[in-house]
Amino acid sequence: MRIEQLREHLRALGARPGHEQSVLRHWACALPQQRRSAREDVLPLALREALPALEAELQGLARLRSEHSAEDGSARLLVALADGQTVESVLLPRDGLCVSTQVGCAVGCVFCMTGQGGLLRQLGSAEIVAQVALARGHRAVKKVVFMGMGEPAHNLDNVLEAIELLGTAGGIGHKNLVFSTVGDERVFERLPQGAVKPALALSLHTTKPELRAQLLPRAPRIAPEDLVAHGERYARATGYPVQYQWTLIDGVNDGDDELDGIVRLLAGRYAVMNLIPYNTVDGLAFQRPAWERAVAMAGALHRRGVLTKLRRSAGQDVEGGCGQLRARALGGARWIKIEPVSGTGAHHVDQF
């Protein structure tokens, strides 16, 4: 379901714009539709009579199948959709929520569990917001990051529609809505045009174009320099820095040569580098580097003029890597290995 379809249904029941916003606010904020102030209790009769069935339908868009709490205060939610498919959401410490935008993913990042199964279907904008409503039934949600299963750029209309609602009726500050992408020209065209302009996170992972093409095999072929240039323009236009995501993988992208590349790209930019040690996935032949190495990299980048945050992967003890919980429920995994090609400085990907 798309939010626009929901709006059309409300209008057919006699809702005026204020009525629409009231119903959508109650839904997105997980407030019972039947509990309204006297001022709000002026909905048209047909709409009031339809509310119980409507509320049940909206709740059915995303239902909790299982919850797995972690020691760091995060909790991974396996969410069942109305058609029986499942996606993952993650309740993050400090009132954050990570939501999914697709069932599966077409980018095929070789270190990501979600990417191994390909794309099954898009989520409708209402299904995306429904994850927020479901989470708000558990705890407060003041920040939403679109970093769960799926590539938001590949479901752009639905994601932007969800962002518009969350940034208005949903009561979430625009900079606390974080659109995460591997990079796509359509994103850089569309985001500046929206009434709600989210913060932007770009999945960089390496400064080497050839290695990035292997790690993210079906991502658009945008050179790291061009990706950063796009990000810088958006950051200056919105007034909040771009977050660059870097999944630290032992022996793959944690070398001193990558440090030099990051400094070349990001020193002096309106940017934050997020170093995220790899969240180990059963069946994938990647490992996180030693914590001491991650700390050393963050410190070196700070000293060389790149604002850097070293993040512990949320939910490491509850299968916190993207797609792990769903894969565990479905069963199956595929081994992937990246090895240096002797004498070339490049890397070779083996899948078996």
UniProtKB/Swiss-Prot annotation:
Record-level GO cellular component terms: cytoplasm
Keywords carried by this UniProt record: 4Fe-4S, Cytoplasm, Disulfide bond, Iron, Iron-sulfur, Metal-binding, Methyltransferase, S-adenosyl-L-methionine, Transferase
InterPro entries: Aldolase_TIM (IPR013785), Methyltransferase_A (IPR040072), rRNA_lsu_MTrfase_RlmN/Cfr (IPR004383), rSAM (IPR007197)
Disulfide bonds, paired cysteine numbers: 98-322
Pfam families: Radical_SAM (PF04055)
Binding site for S-adenosyl-L-methionine: 150-151, 180, 203-205, 279
Protein name: Probable RNA methyltransferase Mpe_A3613
